[in-house]
Amino acid sequence: MSIISTKYLLQDAQANGYAVPAFNIHNAETIQAILEVCSEMRSPVILAGTPGTFKHIALEEIYALCSAYSTTYNMPLALHLDHHESLDDIRRKVHAGVRSAMIDGSHFPFDENVKLVKSVVDFCHSQDCSVEAELGRLGGVEDDMSVDAESAFLTDPQEAKRFVELTGVDSLAVAIGTAHGLYSKTPKIDFQRLAEIREVVDVPLVLHGASDVPDEFVRRTIELGVTKVNVATELKIAFAGAVKAWFAENPQGNDPRYYMRVGMDAMKEVVRNKINVCGSANLISA
């Protein structure tokens, strides 16, 4: 098996009414935990790494791990560059084998965002690499980037249509009321806006900030056309919470084979639930 482009995964999801879960990874243990569940449930999966992830663990190491697990579990998977902002950075990682990238120019004015995304699309498509971009802007914290509520804004459907036409992007992350991180109260998702975007945009749509969003809300976005669901914060909280609890019960403990497994098992429960919410189980052959 191999590392593949998200384009093929998302096209199938769009055609068959489900979503592919995209889980953020941080180290070898998080990769292993996610893929253990995806293999067991035979779910397609996207492993997403932010620039901060690749500062912590080298791309070459992550790529080697993903390739090995793809063979071990006999399943294709996509390794995705999440929230990258530099063409040069993306170019280097694509040359190293990555076949899926998100270029995030959502903090720029529309025309500047288009220009940046188009430059990435032109390069990536020459390398059989799919490209995701974001229009509108989510609030919250992602990696080292923080966006306050005043700077966040929702995606305009007609601008989304024009953006996709001008850039040739393969998938579009839309801002419809979610945010990166956890919520102090139940998020207000603009389902009508999502439906209007789906009517005028034909590429797969992406939901960022899906951690802590009620399952029924996520399912509704999938019914309305979302085909990729990003999950990051919930994974980290589950892992860290379990490890903290283990140390509270085992204050003299020091063997990572024990406490890391506890964290991985807690993370696996989140992964299992998100696969069920996305409706992606049993969609790759054994």
Curated annotation (Swiss-Prot):
Protein name: D-tagatose-1,6-bisphosphate aldolase subunit KbaY
PROSITE patterns registered for this protein in UniProt: ALDOLASE_CLASS_II_1, ALDOLASE_CLASS_II_2
Taxonomic classification: Bacteria, Pseudomonadati, Pseudomonadota, Gammaproteobacteria, Enterobacterales
Leader sequence residues: none
Biological role: Catalytic subunit of the tagatose-1,6-bisphosphate aldolase KbaYZ, which catalyzes the reversible aldol condensation of dihydroxyacetone phosphate (DHAP or glycerone-phosphate) with glyceraldehyde 3-phosphate (G3P) to produce tagatose 1,6-bisphosphate (TBP). Requires KbaZ subunit for full activity and stability.
GO cellular component terms, semicolon-separated: cytosol
SUPFAM superfamilies found in the cross-reference section: Aldolase
Annotated GO biological process: carbohydrate metabolic process; D-tagatose 6-phosphate catabolic process
Organism the protein comes from: Escherichia coli O7:K1 (strain IAI39 / ExPEC)
HAMAP family (alphabetical): TagBP_aldolase_KbaY
Cofactor annotation comment: Binds 1 zinc ion per subunit.
Molecular function in Gene Ontology: tagatose-bisphosphate aldolase activity; zinc ion binding
Sites where the protein binds Zn(2+): 83, 180, 208
InterPro entries referenced in this protein's UniProt entry, alphabetically: Aldolase_TIM, Class_II_FBP_aldolase, FBA_II, TagBP_ald_KbaY, TagBP_ald_KbaY/GatY
